């Protein structure tokens, strides 16, 4: 039986991969690792199988200055791994980001493969010197020369996948993903009013017919037609805790990067009291945790994890 199987962002979580901060700046490691350990403990307490990634190989190439730490994919595995149905995809990361090529990661992918999961890897970009222009305006930094996209550019809603065309994924990446997945799925390339990454900072599907939206990055014009009938919870203004250490590598909206454990239960940064209140007022229970250095390390609870298996089957959610 395939150990991989994910069809939506909200089906009950069964197995997840959690990143590691080891290898980041020393002053951040202990606190962040303790918080990630706490996340793992809470998830295990909810009956979820938890896997941990090893630290990134220090020989990996450095990331561009505005793309985060060199250890990006060990801490943020959702940048590089995407599960759609029973297929695990290694995505063609934006040039300059390291790839998940450690022996331990390969062994994990082999375990999923030998269980019956489909494992595919997108062609890694080769035009790295000209693909990414950090001096271009936000949303125009990726050129359309070959497919590139981070995995968290994609949100799964049954037979429909939202793909944010942005500085984390170009339109060719959406075309490659559609070709790789075939006719069972429809990939919707979306452009928002805010061109910077990532898709999971803009929209959070909470359950059938219910989404959390970032008011700065999503408006009615940029939502695919099939989502316009869904109830939208507008994310309130978030508390910006700022980076206690290190440079900023994510926006002040990182607090909306929440993890859905199952319909009606989400993991939220405990510092976001207004967001928790809004969710609870809409019938969503909240498990409050914290990633103190989230902005410095460019993350949130969704981005530091990869859901590998959720209970559910492939369905259409076009109401």
From Swiss-Prot:
Pathway per the UniProt entry: Antibiotic biosynthesis; streptomycin biosynthesis
Keyword line: Antibiotic biosynthesis, Streptomycin biosynthesis, Transferase
Key word Transferase present: yes
One MF term in the entry's GO annotations: scyllo-inosamine-4-phosphate amidinotransferase activity
Reaction catalyzed: 1-amino-1-deoxy-scyllo-inositol 4-phosphate + L-arginine = 1-guanidino-1-deoxy-scyllo-inositol 4-phosphate + L-ornithine
Protein family according to the UniProt entry: Belongs to the amidinotransferase family.
EC number(s) per entry: 2.1.4.2
Transmembrane segments: none
Function comment: It is not obvious if strB2 participates in streptomycin biosynthesis as an inosamine-phosphate amidinotransferase. The nucleophilic cysteine which is the key residue for amidine transfer is not conserved but replaced by an arginine residue.
Name recorded for this polypeptide: Putative inosamine-phosphate amidinotransferase 2
Region span, Disordered: 50-72
Bias (Pro residues) ranges: 55-65
Protein species of origin: Streptomyces glaucescens
Site (described: Corresponds to active site cysteine in strB1): 303
GO biological process entries: streptomycin biosynthetic process
């Amino acid at each position: 039986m395939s150990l991989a199987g994910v069809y939506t962002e909200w089906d009950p979580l069964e197995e997840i991969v959690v990143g590691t901060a080891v290898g980041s700046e020393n002053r951040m490691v202990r606190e962040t690792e303790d918080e990630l350990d706490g996340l793992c403990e809470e998830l295990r307490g909810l009956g979820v199988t938890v896997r941990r990634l090893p630290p990134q190989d220090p020989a990996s190439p450095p990331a561009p200055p505005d793309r985060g730490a060199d250890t990006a994919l060990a801490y943020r595995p959702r940048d590089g791994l995407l599960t759609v149905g029973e297929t695990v995809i290694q995505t063609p990361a934006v040039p300059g980001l390291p790839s998940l090529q450690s022996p331990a990661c390969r062994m994990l992918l082999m375990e999923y493969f030998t269980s019956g999961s489909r494992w595919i890897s997108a062609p890694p970009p080769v035009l790295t010197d000209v693909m990414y222009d950090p001096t271009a305006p936000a949303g125009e930094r990726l050129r359309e020369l070959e497919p590139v996209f981070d995995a968290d550019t994609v949100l799964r809603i049954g037979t429909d996948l939202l793909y944010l065309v942005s500085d984390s994924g170009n339109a060719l990446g959406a075309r490659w993903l559609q070709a790789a997945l075939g006719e069972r799925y429809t990939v919707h390339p979306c452009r928002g009013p805010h061109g910077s990454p990532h898709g999971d900072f803009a929209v959070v599907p909470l359950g059938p017919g219910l989404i959390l939206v970032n008011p700065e990055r999503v408006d009615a014009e940029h939502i695919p037609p099939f989502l316009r009938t869904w109830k939208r919870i507008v994310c309130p203004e978030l508390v910006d805790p700022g980076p206690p250490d290190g440079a900023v590598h994510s926006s002040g909206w990182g607090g909306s990067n929440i993890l859905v454990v199952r319909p009606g239960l989400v993991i939220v940064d405990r510092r976001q009291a207004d967001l928790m209140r809004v969710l609870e007022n809409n019938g969503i229970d909240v498990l409050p945790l914290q990633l103190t250095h989230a902005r410095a390390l460019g993350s949130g609870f969704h981005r530091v994890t990869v859901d590998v298996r959720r209970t559910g089957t492939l369905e259409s959610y076009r109401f």
